[in-house]
Amino acid sequence: MEKRPQKTLARTLGCSTACCQFVFVLALFAPAILAFHHSTSDTEVSKITDILTAVEVAETPRPDGLVKIFSVVKSHRPDISDGEAWRVSEVILEESAKRHLDPMMVLAVIRVESGFQYTTVSPMGARGIMQIMPETGRFLTETLSGEYGFHPASFRPESLDDPLLNIRLGVYYLHGLTKQFRSLNLALLAYNAGPGEIQNRLENNIAFSEEYATLVLDAYQSFKKSKPPTF
């Protein structure tokens, strides 16, 4: 009989062990998974999703950058499930990379804008985790409809309460402002006050407060210095 190379054998045994662990975890939660077929309530669907996410996390190592984002999200929102926090963290990482922004900067904007609350509404009407004005949200949804398959006709102000949608729109918007003003400070001020207001002040040499930009940059430095936890 042909002797299998030792490294190949070890790899095969390792895969078999991982598969056995995966099957074992699924077996433990089989009753909950089967219950999905008898009820479609949001709570039970969320529980099933979190179970499957937990299994995936156990089997798949997470990059340090994602783990660091997750730790920031959970430190501000200990009330949400790990599965939900991972999903939010993944979107922050993906969108930041796509728009060439530091995810720690995106987290800093979220911290100052909403404190990571999904349904916050400002006195001016800005909504969601990145505090987007409804008219801006509608415009961004139309702009990105081809890229993400958004349906602008179904957009409502309440749509911005979806944190994943809000993050996608907010990161794209911040990216556009950095290109327009060619300055992170000015882009942050425009994110807060509106690009028209900042442009008008620049053209007419009108002073403006940089307090908002300072708050965001302070949060950014704090997040930047923090180390990702080890799980």
Give names to the regions the model predicted.
Residues 52-231:
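Catalytic glycan-binding domains that act on GlcNAc-containing polysaccharides
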Residues 19-20, 24-44:
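Bacterial Sec-dependent signal peptides at the C-terminal "C-region" and cleavage site
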Residues 4-25:
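N-terminal Sec-pathway targeting helices
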